[in-house]
Amino acid sequence: MRLGIKEIEKIIPHRHPFLLVDYIEDMEPGVRAVGYKCVTFHEDFFRGHFPQEPVMPGVLTVEALAQVGAVAILSMEENKGKTAYFGGINKCRFRGKISPGDKVRLETKIIKVKGPMGIGEATASVDGKVVVKAELTFMIG
């Protein structure tokens, strides 16, 4: 199931400049979602991170992965209309950088949902190379 920006905005509350997912390419509610961020030189964060060698902050990549996971969790029938909050992060590793011109593949697999909590395994990659891996916890409210 492909979702454009307008469909994403119906599911999660994030808006520009903090909506970090351009589209969802594939999604199974409560199971997984794959989204993309097409990074341009005009992203606000590049003005200060770093002017001589622009690099997308790793924590923003983690946030983008969390947004993709939130789309998967909040698309479950019982969670529609709710909000997914960032509850925690474990086993996070930064393995590469993201630069202007990169198309970042963001995949979050939901490995557990119990009550108001969910856990996802998240991976960001550029050109098939993993740049970030993390386990994310979501609080659903």
Feature roles, as predicted:
Residues 22-25, 90, 95, 109-111:
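Conserved positions in beta-strands of structured domains
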Residues 18-20, 104, 118:
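Hydrophobic core residues within well-ordered beta-strands of beta-rich domains
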Residues 9, 52, 94-96:
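Beta-strand-rich interaction surfaces with strong enrichment in secreted/lumenal proteins
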Residues 16-56, 61:
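Catalytic strand-loop segment that frames the active site of acyl-thioester-processing enzymes
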Residues 24, 56-79:
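Active-site helix/loop of acyl-thioester processing domains in fatty-acid/polyketide metabolism
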Residues 1-2, 69-105, 131-139:
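Hydrophobic beta-strand-centered segment that forms part of the acyl-chain substrate-binding groove
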Residues 13, 98-102, 109-141:
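HotDog/MaoC-like acyl-thioester-processing domains
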Residues 5-15:
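Short aromatic-glycine motifs in intrinsically disordered, low-complexity regions
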